[in-house]
Amino acid sequence: GSNGPLVILLDDGWSSAASWEARIKAADELIANAENDRRGVAIVPLSEPTRDITLAPAGTARVMVRQLSPKPYAVERVETLPAIARFLKASGDCDIAWLSDGIDTGRGSEFIEGLGKIVENRPLTIFDSGAAPAHALVAAENAAAKMTVKVLRANGGGIDAGVIRALDQKNSPIG
């Protein structure tokens, strides 16, 4: 590590919910290490591309992280790159940690390529969530005797097995 600040990039879209606690725990550990080294910390929720990235004392950063929660939509990480680039240009030497949910929303390689360019020679550590792949249910069609939904998978390979439990407005099971 360096003596420069720590920048924590945090995936916080819908796909991060399954492994949210693990990501917050990892952020806590990173912040504790920065605190021991008396380093400032910048928290960058990747769902907020227009948010100004600012350096804070470790204690403040810890509170900021605990106030975050997963957003109920997909996050376009790419849109955050300009703000990250501005911050890195202004702050110079720093360590960067990306607490990834491991989900590619379609522009993952574009984000990684862009991040690689702006990070330059600064240390970058990517933490994968280690959680089971996320799924989303979309296009629900409710018919008289059945309900059909489409399942979106976070990663394209293989076949998944699982159970979907559907409830009506009165909390009674459907199907």
Please place each PLM-identified region on the residue numbering.
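N-linked glycosylation sequons
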Residues: G1-G175
